[in-house]
Amino acid sequence: MKLSFKCLPVGNLPYENNELATKLTIKLFDNIPFLADLPNADDEDNLLNRTLEGVPGFKLKHKRVIVEDSNRHKLKLTQMDAIFNNPDIDKLEEFKFHTFFLDRYLQIIKRIKPRETVVNLLGPLTIAQLIENKEASQILADKFYRKLFIQTVTIRALWIIHRIKEVSPDTLPIIILEEPLLGRFGDLKRENEELTRDIIVNMYAKITQKIKEFHGAVGIQCFEKCDWKIPIDAGVDLISFDAYTNPNNINIIAEHVNNFLMGGGRINWAIVPVMTEARVKELTIDKLYDRFIKTVEALVLAGVSEYYAYNRASVSIQGNTDKLPLIFAEKAIILAKQLSRKIPTIKAHPTPDSNQ
């Protein structure tokens, strides 16, 4: 499935109510609405709760994650196994989640019936590293817990895909797995020799395969330096990286990236910085465009086809905007949208003998 969006909606929004979030979504992301978190409206509105709250085997308290091993939970996990293998719509409803913006989001989908939409969930590698009563390297090497992470994320994804398809059957749901701790995989591997790269690739592949079977697409988002070969080898449709702070993160695997793009994959360049008010204040569209072109050209010089580098590109802000003053949060998001409209379209398709 070929993704078509040029501006990827990213991060928490700064609003304290649904009305303002709805207004921005319809104005800037009518072709790809997203299920935003609004922590300024509800401090429990976050990806951790969205992904894990109410799931058997996990206990959440003040943003802490505890894994529970009781027999009662293991019985529930057996039920999850059955649902994962045969995703019955009624059974999926047992694992629904709620967010502050969810009802309004589904109303938007029903009303405008967009081509694509985005829902973010926490990815399994990050979930494992947030658990307090188990070592991450040990828990990821344990087949039982990997299965728990895979099924938790997948079942949550399948439920929201079903809800989207209910109101707009032709909309493509893109499930983006947020993996801020993907860059720590090397450290985890050194801590436990049983934890191999193939284990992590296989974990992502199982989630990706099941979501695609349910007519969704899958992306991985990480704004730290990491090994992007892992999600690419797992068969994801999108990788989203910090192109502002780590612009060369994918240049070192240019051949891998080129094959990914040729196969229909897409790269999101999170190149609009939102770290500080001062940084946003000095931004202009000309500065951003110049930086974007130079960053993409560096990838082309590394060996990636210019045709695919530009034609399979989208842009976004670099993270959450809920801590910024409203005027600067909106400025960053608007600039990302403006930049997306300036992404060059390369018309000359590369020949088999040239990567240009």
Please tell me what each predicted stretch does.
Residues 118-121, 174-179, 221, 312-318:
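Extended hydrophobic secondary-structure segments that form protein cores and membrane-embedded regions
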Residues 1-142, 233, 265, 299-302, ...:
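Alpha/beta catalytic barrel-like cores
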Residues 101-115, 153-171, 254-260, 292-308:
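Short amphipathic alpha-helices and their capping/turn segments at secondary-structure boundaries
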Residues 13, 39-41, 122-124, 180, ...:
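An acidic- and aromatic-residue-enriched active-site/binding cleft used to recognize and process polar
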Residues 144-255, 266-269, 273-290, 294:
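Active-site loop segments of alpha/beta catalytic cores
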Residues 20-27, 110, 202, 209, ...:
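Charged/polar, solvent-exposed surface patches and flexible loops
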Residues 237-349:
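Catalytic-face loop-and-helix region of soluble metabolic enzyme cores
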